UniProtKB/Swiss-Prot annotation:
GO CC annotations on file: cytoplasm
Official protein name in the record: Oligoribonuclease
Domain Exonuclease: 8-171
Keywords assigned by UniProt, alphabetized: Cytoplasm, Exonuclease, Hydrolase, Nuclease
Main location: cytoplasm
One GO biological process term: DNA metabolic process
Catalytic-site annotation from UniProt: 129
Pfam families documented for this protein: RNase_T
Molecular-function GO term, any one: 3'-5'-RNA exonuclease activity
E.C. designation(s): 3.1.15.-
Gene: orn
Gene source species: Shewanella oneidensis (strain ATCC 700550 / JCM 31522 / CIP 106686 / LMG 19005 / NCIMB 14063 / MR-1)
Known role: 3'-to-5' exoribonuclease specific for small oligoribonucleotides.
């Protein structure tokens, strides 16, 4: 498949916390859709190795959720560091989307961008500076059409691939219920 500038890159990171100055990325997943939000490619889903010290520093919420999902054990067992995760992800993305054209797509991608900027700059640079943040649409729908909110329920698995799939489904839902384009 030739890279297409109209394709969209969807990303989700799982982190040890919310502060890039002290927390680290522990999982990354990407999907590519066409402009109609049809999934056309799934990138590698990568648990990124972090030290036991980094994992032990996670707060209770992260320990609970990443422990229950099995992510902590996957991170401990992983041999992939951040640089290798970046290389694998860019190799996948380059098949579908030229560098610098796709906005960063997902939920609360501003937070993901902060971590990419800190730890995975080459991957952050692969994106356009714009974001396609489903969270923004959700906030608008909540205020302007609250009855529409009841029609979409997220599973909140806090697993990167499932979270991206839900983000795409959520935007598809809002597109069908709210946007008259």
């Amino acid at each position: 498949m030739a890279a297409d500038a109209n394709n969209l890159i969807w990303i989700d990171l799982e982190m040890t916390g919310l502060e890039p100055d002290v927390d680290r990325v522990i999982e990354i997943a990407t999907l590519v859709t066409d402009q109609e939000l049809n999934i056309i490619g799934q990138g590698p889903v990568i648990a990124i190795h972090q030290s036991d010290e980094v994992l032990a520093a996670m707060d209770d919420w992260n320990q609970k959720h990443h422990g229950e999902s099995g992510l902590i054990e996957r991170v401990r067992a992983s041999q992939v560091n951040e640089a290798e995760a970046v290389a694998q992800t860019i190799a996948f993305l380059a098949q579908y989307v030229p560098k610098g054209v796709s906005p960063m797509c997902g939920n609360s991608v501003g937070q993901d961008r902060r971590f990419l900027n800190r730890y995975m700059r080459e991957l952050e640079d692969y994106f356009h500076y714009r974001n396609l943040d489903v969270s923004t649409v959700k906030e608008l729908v909540k205020r302007w059409s609250p009855e529409t909110m009841a029609g979409f329920k997220k599973q909140n698995t806090h697993q990167a691939l499932q979270d991206i799939q839900e983000s795409i489904a959520e935007l598809q839902y809002y597109r069908s219920k709210v946007f008259k384009i």
